[in-house]
Amino acid sequence: MIRVIFLDLDKTLLPEYDPEPAIPIVEELKKKGFEIVFNSSKTRAEQEYYREKLNVKGPFIVENGSAIYIPSNYFPFEVPGVKRGEYMVLELGVKVEEIRKALKELEAEYGLKYYGNSTDEEIEKFTKLPKHLIPLAKDREYSETIFLWKREGWEKDLIRKGFKVTMGSRFYAVHGNSDKGKAAKLLLDLYKRVDEVESYAVGDGENDFPMFDVVDFAFLIGDLRHENAENVTSIKDVLKKI
């Protein structure tokens, strides 16, 4: 039996941006025998930073389900995808260049601010990111993050152009027709080729809802509600239940 847990990062595993408080959580999950899979709106570069700090080695899902990064030779069979460095990458989203082209057409009309048209100083102000993490957040491949807008309607225009707009813990994300659930299910199907699987997911935002629909046990931090998820106050509560 393989036990897999999908973890959102912001406001779920990470109270803020410091990985230190998450170390005992990750260690406890390892002791319980879990395969830990980050499933976050964060970029590959950001997730690699936290993977290193937290010593997490398995696959991870980036930018709201836009791509799955699987370490080479992780599964005992060939994984379909694009070879990129030490990973096989299963791409489910669209390239960020396509998204930014659409945003460029709308930014003047709606006063949009996002990574692609913001300075490092503006990004620091919007996100409260530590300076050393800003380049990692800017290294986007499949999505953009909307920080500010001056009037409503931009979401509908982007949806009409074929993109998805989802709400995370802090900001709206713009990406292709991908979500955390589609990516999680695809990865679970690969695990099931190895052995029986028991699956879990923990998140705190609306963009986590799709992954709650594809796992056996789901936990929702905070006051939102989802029919397939049990509400908890923090990830520490989850450790007591699994």
From Swiss-Prot:
Its EC number is 3.1.3.70. It is found in: Cytoplasm. Keywords: Cytoplasm, Hydrolase, Magnesium, Metal-binding. It is an enzyme of class 3 (hydrolase). The active site is at residue 8. Mg(2+) binds at residues 8, 10, 169, 204. This is Mannosyl-3-phosphoglycerate phosphatase. It comes from Pyrococcus furiosus (strain ATCC 43587 / DSM 3638 / JCM 8422 / Vc1).
